[in-house]
């Protein structure tokens, strides 16, 4: 992957105060990779700037406050995340990764944003670098921060990314049970894979789908009243866990 070429952005990283940096980067479409950009809602609303960077796909990480500005022209994935330490982002990692990879299979370019391009959206970009290039959190974070100097996931997001890295690189020593379910009421279209502590038959709900992961096997359980979409997404998540 190419290193960021935005010399002005990199210079801003070194000399500006926090407030001045926020103001500067608010209008910057920060290049992370040739086909991956990171920025704010200001950039997300600038059709000409998105066109200049050949953006075809938009990952909106702040649907609670940022609309889909060009839904008839660009392909959107919208997440209704709040920038709070207790917000669970780990359960949607694989759906986010699928969005990235679907766009790249069609030779697309992805723009990722939240309100300011600081915490929510940068966390998703860091996740992608960790996954795609097999990086630890700190290395991926520094890569993104070199391109966008205001990059700063909140401590909750940071810890979840570190924990995910540990989970996918260390051997499975005990059974993990994941529930496949809508992420949240405001965002029923986003299907999440949430770790549950109820490992065993007593923890299974007939309205849901569950994936059990052992040291060497994956099992899919579909409840009698589970929606087809949950079952389909469960199979997608199993494919991810097998990689």
Where would I find each of the regions flagged by the language model?
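Long, proline-/serine-/threonine-rich intrinsically disordered regulatory regions
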Residues: 1-11
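Intrinsically disordered, low-complexity linker and terminal regions at domain boundaries
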Residues: 241-243
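Cysteine-based protein phosphatase catalytic domain of the PTP/DSP
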Residues: 14-112, 116, 131-160, 168-170, ...
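Short, small-residue alpha-helix embedded
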Residues: 121-131
């Amino acid at each position: 992957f190419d290193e960021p070429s935005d010399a002005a952005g990199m210079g801003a990283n070194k000399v500006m105060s926090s407030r001045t940096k926020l103001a500067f980067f608010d209008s910057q479409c920060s290049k992370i990779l040739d086909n991956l950009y990171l920025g704010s809602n200001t950039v997300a609303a600038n059709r000409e700037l998105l066109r200049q960077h050949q953006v075809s796909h938009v990952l909106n990480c702040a649907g609670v406050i940022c609309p889909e500005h060009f839904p008839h022209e660009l392909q959107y994935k919208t997440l209704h995340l709040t920038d709070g330490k207790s917000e669970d982002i780990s359960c949607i990692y694989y759906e986010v990764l699928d969005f990235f990879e679907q766009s790249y299979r069609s030779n697309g370019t992805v723009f990722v944003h939240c309100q300011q391009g600081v915490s929510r959206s940068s966390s998703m970009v860091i996740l992608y670098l960790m996954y795609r290039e097999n990086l630890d959190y700190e290395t991926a974070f520094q890569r993104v921060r070199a391109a966008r100097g205001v990059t700063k996931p909140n401590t909750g997001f940071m810890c979840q990314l570190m924990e995910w890295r540990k989970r996918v690189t260390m051997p499975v020593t005990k059974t993990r049970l994941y529930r496949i379910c809508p992420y949240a009421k405001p965002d029923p279209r986003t299907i999440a894979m949430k770790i549950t502590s109820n490992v065993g038959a007593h923890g299974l709900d007939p309205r849901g789908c569950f994936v059990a992961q052992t040291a060497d096997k994956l099992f899919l359980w579909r409840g009698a009243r589970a929606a087809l979409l949950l079952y389909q997404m469960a199979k997608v998540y199993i494919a991810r866990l097998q990689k």
